[in-house]
Structure formats: structure tokens, C-alpha cells
């Protein structure tokens, strides 16, 4: 494992850069970084809803990662001593189902 490389967090860093730009999205999610649902902000906190954003070029694409998600997956694989690592958003059941499809 390359410890110097492990000091970076490419996906988190990209999300933070996006958050600091204070962009108001016109796509999903509908709460518009908290502006459209103050109750959600009360429940989860401003920081949480402020980084709940849709897939876009600066944040890469989970289905076909080419930048920050790809780099983060490579760092994860390196940290666990694996050849590959893949991020999932559908929960454990979906991850296991996807894993089983790889071997078909």
C-alpha cells in the first residue's frame, strides 16, 4: 500500500470543491441542497444536504468512472490489497447480486 497516495481523498475533495462553489442545482435531488426542504436540513444537517448532489462531470460518474471516482476506487483497492474495488449505492443486497453476475 502506498501510504503517501492514501493521504488523498479524491471523491471527497471534489465534492467539497463543488460545495464551496455554492451552486444551486436545477436537477435532482429535489431539496436543492437544502433550500427546498428546511425539515430535511434540520434532520440531516446543512453539511449533509449540501453535498447531496447528482452525478456530474466534476464529480465523475459511478456507472463509468474516469476521474475522481476511478481514482478513489483505485485507492480503495490499494488499501485492501485487492486488484479492483467498486463503489455501490444500492446497498449490500444489490452489491452481492451484482457480484454474482460477474461470474455468469
Which sequence ranges carry the predicted segments?
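N-terminal glycine-rich, Lys/His-bearing helix-loop that initiates the first secondary-structure elements
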Residues: 1-52
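Conserved N-terminal alpha-helix of the aminotransferase class I/II PLP-enzyme fold
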Residues: 46-95
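N-terminal active-site wall of soluble small-molecule enzyme domains
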Residues: 98
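Conserved small/polar residues in nucleotide/adenosyl-binding loops
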Residues: 102-104
